């Protein structure tokens, strides 16, 4: 998997600050069981807000800079807008092709129900990030099932099975409700459950 060594290099000493989910976690679990990995190029990372430190955020930003990433853009009414929760197109090909950030709503903050992003400030640096909000159950489940593999923090295979099954059902329901969900994005989660479970 391209870029795992870079994540370990930059974030290896900060394992309590994050947990990696998705295809990268799947591949590392498969690798630990001597099974064939699925092609993946990205890192989906939950930032653990209870234990997040300025040192971790600074190291994370070093990884983004050294990889030559740029923030992705989304279309808005006023034109394209930079997003600081998804970093893409690294100039150094030894880094993951993109990194996407997730977290949960910080304690004591009241947000409108339709908000799906939260701002993460690094007080010791001018840099800051955003992250896609997860519901508390998903966030806590991933955190409780964090394990170390290849020098980084990922979710274990039991959590992968549960979360992949949930993603399969969710995408299937969205497609049945008329949303534009590609069949590939439904089938891959089902196939991943079979692969990691056996």
Predicted regions located by residue number:
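Compositionally biased terminal segments of proteins
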Residues: 1-198
